[in-house]
Amino acid sequence: MNLILLGPPGVGKGTQAKLLIDRFGIPQISTGDILRAAVKELTPMGAKAKGYMDSGALVPDEVVIGIVEERLAQADCQKGFILDGFPRTVPQADALGQVLSGMGKSIDHVVSLSVDKGELLKRLTGRRACANCGAGYHVDFAPSKVAGVCDACSGQLVQREDDKEETILNRLAVYEAQTAPLIAYYQAAGLLRSVDGLGTVEGVQSGILAAIRA
């Protein structure tokens, strides 16, 4: 089964991907992870990417696609894969389709997880980290025993810049601008499966399984 997992920051893609990996025995492919791995291993495409990254430039689509193609050609992808965070744009989706076609493969389902903006803000702005040991907490879902104090080392709990409301709103705006055309693209192709990301981890997983088996 070849899946694409879409969803805004804070929707729970990582958690759901792990459950799907365990259930289907297929790898999760995150472009950030495979880009770093390709650069470290100096694969042909990794070497190209390193040149751009060393100069502070964005890695162009054709190099990212090449790295994705290298990864999809590996043996553990023969039974399927989960693409997480890729494609991000319609041109990337077109290029991915061409790569897969050349490999005799195609995307089976595109799962789009959605949660309303208020809930996403609550999930993300509530995150706290210990300034001393790095332990993670959440003011609503996983609070420390003493407010603002780490249970493990008594360090101060802080909110990262990435978790501040203004930063999150900007990230969500970028995601929506990029992904709206992509959702329309996959909907037109008959591949989109929309799943409500609000609920328990198990409940959302059941929703995903029902959607891809429908």
Swiss-Prot record:
Binding site for ATP: G10, V11, G12, K13, G14, T15, R127, G199
Recorded catalytic activity of this chain's protein: AMP + ATP = 2 ADP
Gene3D superfamilies: P-loop containing nucleotide triphosphate hydrolases
Annotated region (LID), positions in chain: 126-163
Pfam families linked: ADK (PF00406), ADK_lid (PF05191)
Chain positions recorded as Zn(2+) binding sites: C130, C133, C150, C153
EC identifiers of the protein: 2.7.4.3
Domain of life of the organism encoding this protein: Bacteria
GO function terms (MF aspect): adenylate kinase activity; ATP binding; zinc ion binding
One GO-annotated biological process of the protein: AMP salvage
Transmembrane stretches, start-end: none
PANTHER family reported in the protein's UniProt record: NUCLEOTIDE KINASE
NCBIfam families: adk, PRK00279.1-2, PRK00279.1-3, PRK14527.1
Name the record gives this protein: Adenylate kinase
Gene: adk
